[in-house]
Amino acid sequence: MPVKSLIKGFHRSVGRNVHGKITCRHKGGGHKRRYRIIEWQRKESIAKVAAIEYDPNRSARLALLHYRDGTKSYILQASGMKVGDEVKAGVDAELQPGHVWPLSAIPLATQVHSIELVANKGAQLVRAAGCFAVVVAKSPSYVALKLPSGEIRQIAANARATIGRVGNEVHSQRVLGKAGRSRWLGIRPTVRGSAMNPVDHPHGGGEGRCGIGRSRPLTPWGKPALGVKTRKRPNIYVLRNRSKN
């Protein structure tokens, strides 16, 4: 059972905006959840792992920490972290999974996760199960990281990251087994455009099973799909764009 002081109720938007209109398709329903409050911004401290818990809101597992002053908090479980381990934050910590270091002090080729984009703002990058980034270059002001997408990005050297990769690496190999498990997760069916009527999708219509009748695939709103660039503004901190599938 989760710690009562570290959970709260929350209302999921299930793909709707404030007016109730669908802005993200294929979302809705699902089992009721309670949000686990996670400590994304870890201060210099020492704590002991008291339990490893399931979190319905993310793919990673959570580690429950007990601090020496009696406080408790949740963090993402790093790969290899187990009950009874001691985790530290700060430059005095050893280079072990789950310990937090400033990027400027982390050696090259080290795997890291839960990375801050802005110093003292809290972890924002690389938080999904099994993910890790690699430190590839360092300068006095910035550290270059290779992210899971293949993108190489500069981040301020005084930002912090957690050593190691996120645990629960087998998450990507799970088999849901039936449509009902997707519905429990709040994922609604995805209908092919070619199975719709012409009024509903540019690919719709035709007699029986037939092609889309267009020179290229289109979105439900008539815009080109597959291979069209969506990022307009360049980012000065991105040294190499992510690898395309």
UniProtKB/Swiss-Prot annotation:
It is found in: Plastid, Chloroplast. PANTHER family: LARGE RIBOSOMAL SUBUNIT PROTEIN UL2M, RIBOSOMAL PROTEIN L2. This is Large ribosomal subunit protein uL2c. Keywords: Chloroplast, Plastid, Ribonucleoprotein, Ribosomal protein. InterPro entries: NA-bd_OB-fold, Rib_uL2_dom2, Ribosomal_uL2, Ribosomal_uL2_bac/org-type, Ribosomal_uL2_C, Ribosomal_uL2_CS, Ribosomal_uL2_dom3, Ribosomal_uL2_RNA-bd_dom. Signal peptide: none annotated. One of its GO terms (biological process) is cytoplasmic translation. Part of the 50S ribosomal subunit. Residues 192-216 are annotated as: Disordered. Belongs to the universal ribosomal protein uL2 family. One of its GO terms (cellular component) is chloroplast. One of its GO terms (molecular function) is transferase activity. It comes from Cyanidioschyzon merolae (strain NIES-3377 / 10D) (Unicellular red alga). Its main location: plastid. It holds the Pfam family Ribosomal_L2. Gene3D superfamilies: 2.30.30.30, Nucleic acid-binding proteins, Ribosomal protein L2, domain 3.
